[in-house]
């Protein structure tokens, strides 16, 4: 968690007012996200916590611009977000990137790793740089995530382990340097050791480029470990939000208290009868 400074005025990078998403109509209507308000500041690590079906992934898709907002308004850098048309949406996506739960599904299986990283440089506007300089930049990005670029050349992403694939995703973010990173359950499919490494790398990257990181997770323990701000989501609504310390150590909402009580404690005897 970041040490707060009350005198520090940080700008809003993503703000939502009454953001709502409705699927279907009539009797088949489902309100997935129900009039939520939020204000994500530059450089913060924000975690949206909720169980499956709470609406957090639907909200993340609206933040990314993958699906439309039914009601309400999303503001980007202080102004109403305008991503109508391919050109505006492409420009927006230069500044907001995502890491998903399944890294394998994020890659084109026919693209070699060097092509994946080169695409990032081209997207960033480095297409005309000498190849020697591009190689140096890709080497630096891989080094940041403890990978060796020379060992990845001519390999495909599917030849890497799950943890290595997620580290490669972070290398992409290192090259792209977006203003916002949305990480949807980025550590749920990798082992505990790799999970800790990935979280440390994302925190370090936030510190280096002042990137806003939005985590989507069901793991309230993870939220406490890494977050500056936490939003608790239940049935499409935010039932509680604020500083991570306040929300998780001094919860007010019954749902938040239940999420915390469900976290196994190492000193308690676990009930394995239902396993």
Predicted feature residues:
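Conserved ABC ATPase signature
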Residues: 156-160, 164
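The feature captures the beta-strand-to-loop junction immediately N-terminal to the Walker
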Residues: 49-51
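ABC ATPase NBD coupling module
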Residues: 81-97, 115, 123, 247-251
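Conserved ABC transporter NBD signature motif
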Residues: 72-82
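Helix-to-loop junction immediately C-terminal to a conserved catalytic motif
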Residues: 64
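A short, surface-exposed alpha-helical micro-motif characterized by mixed small hydrophobic
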Residues: 223-225
